[in-house]
Amino acid sequence: VLEQNKQFGIGMNNELSAVTFGFYAAEELTAADGSVIPVDGLIEIMSLDENGKAVLKSDVPFGSYYVKEISTDSHYILSDEKYPVIFAYAGQEIPVVELAVNDGKSITNEMIYVEIYGMKKDEDGKALAGATIGLFLTDGTEPILTTVSAEDGSFSFTGIPYGEYVVREIAAPEGYVMDDTPY
């Protein structure tokens, strides 16, 4: 499950396609052909479908395994947690076995949040208070958020999902000309 942020349009654009998990042996195992799978041996890299499910294509012996995230979308924190998987005998009449990871509970990816800050100065390099600054998506025409520069010219946007944005003045203080240069 990916954390979503509708305001910034993150988590609803097939970000799951960037998530992969490794399927590892949690104990030394012997395969049907006699080969040994070592502890922490990577057996397969699995991609997620649009529903967040993965399919293990390898034939594996009964035993203890774990999955661990190998890659994720750039907006999210890559987890180093190991999620246990137990593969027990289900009867020889069962051609396909469904394995539950993390006791069947969803694995959640947490978003990376950042702060964007800057200084507004006049043409002489002096701090400029009262400028309205907008934060835009790189292809956006309307600001996602706005703020006003403080007495020392500083401004900031906090709790912003990691990504690429444009910062631009959208209203100048009285007596000044607006600088709409995108940064």
Task: Enumerate the language-model features and the residues they cover.
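Solvent-exposed loop/turn and edge beta-strand elements of beta-rich ligand-binding domains
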Residues: V1-Y183
